[in-house]
Amino acid sequence: ETENLFSLLENQPESKDSIIDIYNAMIEEANRKNIALAFKYASTPSGLARLFMTRNYIDKDTLRQVLASLPTDMQKSKMGLNIKAHLDTEQLSVGSTLVPFPCVTEENVEFDWNQLKGKQILLLYGGLGCMGDEGREYLKTLYKQTNREDLEIVLYWPSSSIEDLKSVKEHYVGNDYAFVSDFKLDASPIRIKYGCQATPTCFLTDKDHIIVVKSEG
């Protein structure tokens, strides 16, 4: 259904507002159903994973109560600990300062966040496939038409290995901005501290690395 909406958006740009309203309503309904299923099956591995997936849409007090009601082994599982980390962490939002975290490039070289000092940053969480050709071309053009002294684009990819990160970089050939990952998947700071779930999630900062825009999807 979402693909049909995106197709409509391309073919009927004059209906953009109405199509976006429909899309938002679909997302809201999907989230409502996912949360209900997460609560119902929270004591199972798949339900706990769904609970983590919907964490950003659940009040933390409620989420804490649900987690506390689960068997100890579920609470101490990887996903249970990820949910606890989410609960114990204040997520970044507009007005927050970007928080560097250890990660590497596709060449397995530690990414140096210090090189970004004094520059605006556009940090993206995944999403190159989701954004389509138009979105990828926009990023390429933005990178080429801006000065690296003013703006850096950093793409975090949720890879499980350096080989996976390399293959992603090779697949999206021609994208010269930085590709990075820490291979921690759901336990990564990009998921816990930054609160990323939907792809792409984008953070635009000012030159002091204060987040001025955050967008999802």
Name each region found by the language model.
Residues 134-173, 185-191:
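Structural microenvironment flanking redox-active thiols in thiol-disulfide oxidoreductases
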Residues 81-113:
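N-terminal "domain-start" segment that seeds a small globular fold
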Residues 111-139, 152:
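Short active-site neighborhood of thiol/selenol oxidoreductases, capturing the structured segment around
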Residues 174, 184-217:
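Thiol/disulfide oxidoreductase modules built on the thioredoxin-like
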